[in-house]
Amino acid sequence: MLKFIDLFAGIGGMRLGFEQAMHELGIETACVLSSEIDKHAQTTYAMNFHEQSQGDITQIQDFPSFDFLLAGFPCQPFSYAGKQKGFGDTRGTLFFEIERILKAYRPKGFLLENVRGLTTHDKGRTFKTILQKLHELNYGVYLILNSSNFQVPQNRLRVYIVGLDQSQPELTITSHIGATDSHKFKQLSNQASLFDTNKIMLVRDILEDHPLDKYNCSTDFVNKLLAFIGHPIKLNGKRLIDYRNGNSIHSWELGIKGECTSDEIQFMNALIANRRKKHFGAHQDGKKLTIEQIKTFFEHDDLDSIMQSLITKGYLQEVNGRFNPVAGNMSFEVFKFLDPDSVSITLVSSDAHKIGVVHQNRIRRITPRECARLQGFPDSFQFHPKDSLAYRQFGNSVSVPVVKAVILDLFKSADLASCF
């Protein structure tokens, strides 16, 4: 019997992947403690595992005996924690809770999961401190994996840190990293999944056939989209956002805040196409430009009236004589339409509910069940009855098949199955 604890458990994605791996290896398991501070996530966890998670990990002092630790912990800067000791002190952070538990209970192994940004967070000091602390405990090795390589049609890069007591695991698993910008990721047709080499999963594989009408985009929004783009299939892969050019649709092209003339549309498109050029400044998302700078790439006899009209409609803003788009994607019902023949952008908790798809002649948002499938959750998994919470929870979760694959690799490479 292998006993494990599930910390920062969320809705149980790591536990699910771990238990699937153990079942495949023929190892009986028991979760002896789970901890999750969010009460709504606790509800979903209880619905699926029929156990009530304990709350705040910092308030749990005594743990039952266990062999393995699972944790998807939040990312926090260590250089600001424990000011008395300065850099390298992990006190006051949630990783410290993992550190104290590992030190006190010395489990056989662990799996930690975090965002890819952990490796560069606080100029790399956060990750360096984590690895240093684990090394001091004689634990730890890490890898970066993309969910799209594990029978999950989602571009999701995550850091997985695994450890064995008094041993350095030698993992064989690897992953194609893909594009840094999730919107630019395109799965290669010859790129086999490391989880199932016989099939590459695409968005179309996870779509529901008859989702409820409540997931349809509004008639007004659909009409605006079709008036601009023509055939619905042209929406595949399109991004709806006002501060980027490229394969994007903009609010002024749809008339979201008010219909625009062709001259006004041309002006706004020229502005976002040129404002990021280096000779205007090195700002990542573009610099506010003066009228003189704007005239270097857009000439029109009625330029002043065009710009004033756009300011009045809410597409353009002026700050101290400089101009910039009123940027963002919050004005759209959907900010990205998935390409059914590719993989999804990364699900995140804040806007998983605003991802769209064109399927069976319907222009709609993806459903909570489709979000679950993008994370590799089985259809037997029950999601929260409130859609807004279900979207957020799946955006916060882990990709179940990746956890399963990492655990299988760890146990097979270290011959751990014989220990339980």
UniProtKB/Swiss-Prot annotation:
Query: What CDD domains is this protein classified in?
Result: Cyt_C5_DNA_methylase
Q: Pfam families per the record? A: DNA_methylase (PF00145)
Q: Name one GO molecular function term.
A: DNA (cytosine-5-)-methyltransferase activity
Active-site residues are C75
Q: What is its EC number?
A: 2.1.1.37
Annotated signal sequence is none
What positions belong to coiled-coil segments? none
List residues of the SAM-dependent MTase C5-type domain.
2-417
Keywords noted in UniProt: DNA-binding, Methyltransferase, Restriction system, S-adenosyl-L-methionine, Transferase
The family database entries (PROSITE patterns) matched by this protein are listed as: C5_MTASE_1, C5_MTASE_2, SAM_MT_C5
Reaction(s) catalysed by this chain's protein? a 2'-deoxycytidine in DNA + S-adenosyl-L-methionine = a 5-methyl-2'-deoxycytidine in DNA + S-adenosyl-L-homocysteine + H(+)
PANTHER family, per the entry: TRNA (CYTOSINE(38)-C(5))-METHYLTRANSFERASE (PTHR46098:SF1)
Q: What is this protein called?
A: Type II methyltransferase M.HgiCI
Q: Which organism is it from?
A: Herpetosiphon aurantiacus
Q: Species lineage, top-down?
A: Bacteria, Bacillati, Chloroflexota, Chloroflexia, Herpetosiphonales
